[in-house]
Amino acid sequence: MENVAAIILAAGKGTRMKSGLVKVLHPIAGRPMIDWPLEAARGAGAAPVVLVVGHQAEAVRERFQGAGDIACALQAEQLGTGHAVACAAPALAGFSGTVLILCGDTPLLRGGTLTDLLAFHRSQGAAVTVLTARMENPHGYGRVLRDEAGRVLRIVEQKDASPQECSVREINSGIYCMEAGFLFDNIGSLGNDNAQNEFYLTDLVAMAAQKGATCLAMAIEDSDEIMGVNDRAQLAQAARILRRRINRDLMLSGVSLVDPEQTYIDQGVVIGPDTLIHPNCSISGPTQIGNGCQIESGVSISSCRIGDRCRIKAGSVLEDSELRADVAVGPMAHLRPGTVLNDHVKIGNFVETKKTVMGEGSKASHLTYLGDAEIGRDVNIGCGTITCNYDGVKKHRTLIGDNVFVGSDVQLVAPVRVGADSLIAAGTTVTRDVPAGSLAISRTPQVNREGWRIRMKKKT
């Protein structure tokens, strides 16, 4: 929608989180909490957006540094929601449209709900519209009081409510839609004569009714959307609801989740159809997974690009890595940042890679460390191979050409280059470059001392 701005209240410390991190920056489904209502506001067409910051203001500002549609307003002392909005007013000087007022700790709010709220507000010519919900247990919420015609008369906070008012089950979400003219003409008139000695934004509702301005409420069907997060238990509850949404959207797009309740996928992860994901997997960051992949139980994937038909076996950990098509990884493999596996590569159990590129068809089937390495096509890395990439001061690279066979228990002391079509014998420590087509072997010749064991037993 056009001519819409938003104010998001994010100045509170979040004492009940018992954390050194300000509440709105706590992560939920892969994003700081504040990102979710911000995304909802943007989804409804709001621009600019003013964030009211207070505790750890610089950390919140830094999060949105460079975002051209966002301004920050400082609420140095937290004196209530009305005071917070008053602090935001200068950032919207000259704005004459409709203002959405949101809470920074409502990560479940959808952009579509705000679009509906705006449409309802404008269609009724309202000055103020409150988003409400009807709850079986409204304890702790402000109650919405209406007249016989259904118009909103006022909102009373629970601490200030009478027993009769506490029996009302329609509650205030803390989310509002207001015309800028009414809002900024009256925000300075709020008082703090209440149980908490704060400037309540809700008092604008009663003020609108007294002045004959239209004040309405739109009840939301899904009360989860307006759930505020105040402590770690509520954070986990909100995260669970977000995961259900994310997982449902993925399943409807053709992804199979064996147990959605035990699958942890961040918002923004892209997964292709016919991919199968087993329980207890965590997929985070800007990860992209292709079509027809299999992700087995206990896998952790962070910020990776995975091509079609890959299989990630149980217990593997993948970080900042790229897998092309038809790659097999694991079980119990660890791909560290900078790993690139080309088509048909196999990484087996207890293999660790870091800043390593493996060419098409190459394999390291078990018990291997490959760090700072570039490996060609159709290379076999034997069991127990180690690239010795660190000399105690600097890291060095290992370069292995195409069609090389590396036997078991080989150490490649970098910097070193192994030419194409060569063979490294089992147990060899490679300290010099190996020419193409060569055999490299550095073992001590085997000596068999016949009868030695029998003689030793007799001595004991």
Swiss-Prot record:
Chain residues that bind acetyl-CoA: N389, Y390, S408, A426, R443
Please name the GO terms of the biological process aspect recorded for this protein, alphabetically.
cell morphogenesis; cell wall organization; lipid A biosynthetic process; peptidoglycan biosynthetic process; regulation of cell shape; UDP-N-acetylglucosamine biosynthetic process
Q: Where is this region: Linker?
A: 233-253
Residue ranges that the Swiss-Prot or TrEMBL entry lists as coiled coil: none
How this chain assembles, per its entry, is:
Homotrimer.
Location in the cell: Cytoplasm
Tell me what this protein is called. Answer: Bifunctional protein GlmU
**Organism of derivation:** Pelobacter propionicus (strain DSM 2379 / NBRC 103807 / OttBd1)
Name the enzyme group at the top EC level: transferase
What Enzyme Commission number does this protein have? 2.7.7.23, 2.3.1.157
Which residues carry out catalysis?
H366 (proton acceptor)
In residue numbers, the region (Pyrophosphorylase) covers 1-232
Per the annotation, how and in what number is the cofactor bound? Binds 1 Mg(2+) ion per subunit.
**Requisite cofactors:** Mg(2+)
User: Where UDP-N-acetyl-alpha-D-glucosamine is bound, by residue?
Assistant: 9-12, 23, 75, 80-81, 142, 157, 172, 230, 336, 354, 369, 380
User: So what family is this one in?
Assistant: In the N-terminal section; belongs to the N-acetylglucosamine-1-phosphate uridyltransferase family.
Keyword list (alphabetical) reads:
Acyltransferase, Cell shape, Cell wall biogenesis/degradation, Cytoplasm, Magnesium, Metal-binding, Multifunctional enzyme, Nucleotidyltransferase, Peptidoglycan synthesis, Repeat, Transferase
Give the source's domain of life in one word. Answer: Bacteria
- Gene Ontology cellular component list: cytoplasm; membrane
| Region described as N-acetyltransferase | 254-460
Binding-site list for Mg(2+): D105, N230
Question: What reaction does this enzyme carry out catalytically?
Answer: alpha-D-glucosamine 1-phosphate + acetyl-CoA = N-acetyl-alpha-D-glucosamine 1-phosphate + CoA + H(+); N-acetyl-alpha-D-glucosamine 1-phosphate + UTP + H(+) = UDP-N-acetyl-alpha-D-glucosamine + diphosphate
Q: Which Pfam families match?
A: Hexapep, NTP_transferase
Single Gene Ontology MF annotation: magnesium ion binding
Q: What is the role of this chain?
A: Catalyzes the last two sequential reactions in the de novo biosynthetic pathway for UDP-N-acetylglucosamine (UDP-GlcNAc). The C-terminal domain catalyzes the transfer of acetyl group from acetyl coenzyme A to glucosamine-1-phosphate (GlcN-1-P) to produce N-acetylglucosamine-1-phosphate (GlcNAc-1-P), which is converted into UDP-GlcNAc by the transfer of uridine 5-monophosphate (from uridine 5-triphosphate), a reaction catalyzed by the N-terminal domain.
